[in-house]
Amino acid sequence: MLPMQGAPTYDDIVLKREMPVHKGGPDPEKEDRVMLTRHRVSRILFDTKFYDYPISLKPETFKNFGVLTTLRVGFSYLGSMFHKLPEDNLENFYINCFGRKLYSMFFEYYTENLWGRHPSEIDASWGAQRTKGLSIMGILKDFFGKLFKVKNRKVNTSLIEEFKYPKLGPGQLWDVTAAEVEKLGGTIIKNAKVTKLHKNADNVLTSLTYEKDGQEFTMEGDYFISSMPVKDLVGGMNDVPAEPARIAKGLPYRDYMTLGVLVPKINLVNKTNIKTINNIVPDCWVYVQDRNVKLGRFQIYNNWSPYMIKDLEHTVWI
């Protein structure tokens, strides 16, 4: 939908950073319809100290831990290797992957704070989806792969160091997608409630009925895509069998609040070797796993795209 950048971004120019560009691609300094390549930095803020996300084997990690905690983490992981727990919940899954000590430090409280449930009450399959195979062993393999410069090594998605991002943020991607759908003959209906689905003799969906502004409409189509929660979608259908309807009705949902704040500065010191505009911390995400605050994580939009902040030199958007 959005072509890759063919020239450096504003911050890469100012900081003289080299990032890959695509020959013939648009210049983000001149055009808006462009996808940027960004450096991925995400860290954990725990006990007022920064840790790599996911945890890495760097001297800074062990310095932050201290000798005693490092030993506890190591022996805890060894214990989890020889004594595997039944993976019938998320807590046991994390303990098997990282050891009980790391689990209690970085996963237990954060998970409960984010999802509103203790990990022991969440299915283990959720952990497999979230971590995508990441474990201490995976971190070790990645560490030695980098150390010995192993070519074509498989990189876990949680360890990827670059990502693609729309110049004006994710909303831009959906705006462009919507425009392309309509350009190709599709129809997008907003602020409407689907009330009935109509199928033919072969049980294929051919049309639907929806309500909008107090009126009822019927629409035919080859494909129907819904953006509403599955629970509400199934609840609005007229002929759902009892068992699927019961399952859909029981699906739990977790609401969260996103708050954008524009500030002149943040009181976090950039102690990394990564250059940034105004020397702010280079993180995209900061996962707050400190038990002293009721906060899951925060973004620093300056590091996602320099074009999303009006005064990049003097303000920070989090």
State where each predicted segment sits.
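A broad structural signal for alpha-helix termini and local helix breaks/kinks
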Residues: 2-5, 98, 115, 237
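A residue-level signal for conserved active-site and pocket-lining positions in enzyme catalytic cores
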Residues: 48, 94, 111, 177, ...
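Mid-domain catalytic core of redox enzymes
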Residues: 192-316
